[in-house]
Amino acid sequence: MKSVVNDTDGIVRVAESVIPEIKHQDEVRVKIASSGLCGSDLPRIFKNGAHYYPITLGHEFSGYIDAVGSGVDDLHPGDAVACVPLLPCFTCPECLKGFYSQCAKYDFIGSRRDGGFAEYIVVKRKNVFALPTDMPIEDGAFIEPITVGLHAFHLAQGCENKNVIIIGAGTIGLLAIQCAVALGAKSVTAIDISSEKLALAKSFGAMQTFNSSEMSAPQMQSVLRELRFNQLILETAGVPQTVELAVEIAGPHAQLALVGTLHQDLHLTSATFGKILRKELTVIGSWMNYSSPWPGQEWETASRLLTERKLSLEPLIAHRGSFESFAQAVRDIARNAMPGKVLLIP
């Protein structure tokens, strides 16, 4: 079979290997139909951030069951599934409480083991989520990134009737905007530095948009004055400036969910830190996208929203291609910003 393999120093190549075999009774083999490049893959590709090399990345994928182990009786060849990439131990105290993202002995498809940039993959039954028969198979590759924002909503006890502010209009942010609209947010505001992304956010239902390269935090806060209560802010950009911005614009008693992963140190001034106290903000750390019962209500909600056609995915896709085309699109990101979702279609 073919796969896209990463070596150190940003080398991306297409390789041939044997189709993997099922070795354990709780495993399934998936013939991959669509696999998406995640922003978290970029440090693994270009900054030697993977756990080992060579490695096949890819944790956002969907496909069809090709074979099942003897212990799997609820899935059959031809069934459509999406990847659930985290593999916690399920036995430690954290897992027994349903805190799967805090498992210290976890494995992860496409990071700590080879992933879905390939024609086939063998994974545990627990690592696939059954898709409805009427869902387009490509949509299934978006379930994992959709659940990232939904997990933040879950930790905040929902977004219904709240004034939701999404900072960062990348794929995660744009999906979260659509989910907030679909789940009954009172208002949705999008903040980014790209006018193109903000226009997309507006088309997805954002009531208003702020370009943070053109507006100051006090200006944004002034516009948000009538929406200052019952706020839920999602910081999805993952840069120190946007974390500080979130604190600056937050209304009293706002919830602030930190979703984006920082790759630079964050240094808060005493004045900014003081605003967390004075506004009595609730700061929520949001890590991955799992809850109990496994893999979590987030996954059921994502599936439902897709089935109900509440989410628009096509505008998020920048590139579709088979192995060589996909590999070249990945290489191109070294010279240009990631333009949107890049999909491998084996």
UniProtKB/Swiss-Prot annotation:
Keyword terms: Galactitol metabolism, Metal-binding, NAD, Oxidoreductase, Zinc
UniProt-recorded Gene Ontology molecular function terms: galactitol-1-phosphate 5-dehydrogenase activity; identical protein binding; protein homodimerization activity; zinc ion binding
UniProt cofactor note: Binds 2 Zn(2+) ions per subunit.
Record-listed E.C. numbers: 1.1.1.251
Gene Ontology cellular component annotations, sorted alphabetically: cytosol
Catalytic activity field: galactitol 1-phosphate + NAD(+) = keto-D-tagatose 6-phosphate + NADH + H(+)
Binding site for Zn(2+) 1: C38, H59, E144
An individual GO BP term: galactitol catabolic process
InterPro entries membership: ADH-like_C, ADH-like_N, ADH_Zn_CS, GroES-like_sf, NAD(P)-bd_dom_sf, PKS_ER, Zn_alcohol_dh
Obligatory cofactor(s): Zn(2+)
Keyword Transferase: no
Residues reported in the UniProt entry to bind Zn(2+) 2: C89, C92, C95, C103
Pfam families linked: ADH_N, ADH_zinc_N
UniProt record similarity statement: Belongs to the zinc-containing alcohol dehydrogenase family.
Role: Converts galactitol 1-phosphate to D-tagatose 6-phosphate.
Name of the protein this chain belongs to: Galactitol 1-phosphate 5-dehydrogenase
Source organism of this protein record: Escherichia coli (strain K12)
